Amino acid sequence: MNTLTNSSINFSVDPQSRSFSLFSSTFKSAKLDRASFDLELMTANGKAEFSFTSQEQTDNSISLTYHDRSQKLELTVVFNLFPDKAFLFQKMRLENHGDETVTVKRFLFSQVQAGMLHFSENQAIQTAFYSNGWQSWSPSGTWQAGEKQIRSRLKPFAHPMIYNPGTPLTKAESEFSSDMFAAILDHQARVGLIVGFLSQKEQFGSIVSTLHPEPDLQIWANCDDLQLLPGKQLQSDTLVWQFSDTLNPEPFKAYFEAVSAENQVRQRMKTPVGWCSWYYYFQKISPEIIRSNLRAVQKTQEQFPLDVFQIDDGFEQDVGTWDKFQPIFPDGMKPLSQEIHNAGYQAGVWLAPFIVQRDSELVNTHPEWLLKTIKGKRANSGFVWNNLGYALDLTIPEVEEFVRQTIRRAVSDWEFPYLKLDFLYAAALDCDYSNPIFTRAQVLRKGLEIIREEAGDNAILLGCGVPIGSGIGIFDMLRISADVSPDWAPKFLGLKSIFRNEPNMPSAKNAIQNILSRSIMEPHLWVNDPDCLLVREDSNLSLPEVQSLATAISITGGAVLISDDMSKLSADRLKLAASLLPVLPAKPHVRDLFSQNMPSQISQDLQNAQGDWKLIALFNWQDQAVDLQLNLKDWGFDEQEMLMREFWSSEIAQIQQSHTFKNVEAHGVRLIALRPLRPLTYLGSDLHLAQGVELKHWQLADSNLEIGLDLGRKAEGTVYLWSEKEPRSVEQNGKNTHWQWKDNILTLKVTLDKETTIHLKF
């Protein structure tokens, strides 16, 4: 038995039985006992069997070597435990020293039998599983023991898009699966086991667990029947193991920091604020529509300042033919990008370089470029553009050059420095590559690296419809949710009931699901793209649903891109959109991340010139109005009197223990700014959802109070203060201003030309 120890973990491995155990030093009874590891590969003589041959050990690592009967196939398994890390690191490598090609199916990192994973001295009876979906649109969230993981029923239409072919689609109660990383949790013990691959450059990782009656666990890396040639080797990505406190407000922080370091994540960009054409016009765009919205955003720039203006799908001849345009775009894209730049915005354009529309010209001119199945048929990339689509085989050199030219053309010839790159999963379908010496993960990663290489280091790249692990270190922004839509629940061709529970179809509900459950990825990996903000009045979203979408986008700190006809927005809806600016920092705490599949309680701890406050969002995901309860103890305030202002209703209250919000609308939200009670307290405003970021200066001297407000934009609205004394006078920028004092609430009407100063005398 070989052992490694640090302050967090005691690790032991038995090379002969190919099993290891993990004991937590932090959580005394948490342990993983006798987890087995292996390799599945096929030779000309059948499945290869491996035997232990040698080992090496240092202070921080154990390296075990195994050989097959021919002694020509060498498997190395390396475990690392470093003094300053709370993880166990595990990695595998296969070398082919023989003269025959072998078929590699998967690296089996761990198989843990039921009863071998413990979180406390007692049997785990309140368990849950956090599941990360394969790509941007794949549903993510926590499932409780006894529940069933929701799956799409649209097999040929949706499955190729959202599910990794190597990850089982568990369907029974208490059976769950995840891609790249996951967490198994014991609510009673308040301990969880986080497992995850640090990258997905080599293989796509799969994690499967059955929670009842006791949790088991399987983890493997999919090698996709890769053909390992003589003299070649195949290595895995690194897997890490960590026991964690489930009450930690950032339970995945250490894991994502390790992922960030492994992938050399790009320096975080300023969170973009912009406009996108897709969710109002879809493919029905024209140069005049683009120019009309460009003029409109210029007119509202002082009230709603944007920095990105992005043209989406609809300009190209077809998806697959990127060097020709729709007849309505006779001059191509360069004139539009120049107009956008001249107007002061960063010009963005949509591309889908790996997928091919079924009726694309490319299908006829280069049928040999299309991905094939193992039966020789064209691989199905899912239901796109009202038909089943195709995909490109990136292992063909001519296809690689085609992708290079497509990116080069958009960035250099059309002069778009901001690219929204969509449907990228298509390079990694369940397929038979022309060159079978690569895994699907390797093919996709190389394709993404080609995109970054051709776009250049200064280009802003947004990945969409991309497997999560593949994009780390490549993209500045990454879509983390299903498409939003002007409808709350999915529908197609007007039909609602049969599509209502589809977890990945475009809808506001499905977008918000992942916006909240994947908010944990930021700021560690990229700027989260929660998809677009829709505030227009002529959609099928109710006002409470619009408020919920805006709240979810704002409180998670992701990108803000509006997708409405800007020339038609009412003043009220423009003010609603502007209330998200400036963008909040990306440091949300999803309180019920591990207890609800669709989280409903999320907060941010914020600070301004007067001090700290907590911003809390309470959502009602029911289809009818309900009462929502705010309990101070749940948010860390015990027997402390607090002041509260709710943004959407302007309700203000003193709270000592709890507060009930009556009849919160279906799919609605209450957004609460919570502050300690003081004789004079800034309660917030209707200028910004956070109700406090605008306060840049607060100076109280004798009986005089000076307040400085700054939003970086023009705005008109109302500021609220708690004051136990009525002021004698209130001035804004040296002039008397309208104010009202009643029941200790001081209401001030303010106008900001980006900033303003208010003087109060008591």
Regions found by a protein language model. Give the residues of each.
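Polysaccharide-binding surfaces and accessory modules of carbohydrate-active proteins
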Residues: 2-9, 13, 18-205
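Solvent-exposed beta-hairpin/edge-strand motifs
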Residues: 112-124, 633-649, 721-734
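Glycan-recognition and catalytic regions of carbohydrate-active enzymes
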Residues: 157, 528-538, 561-624, 652, ...
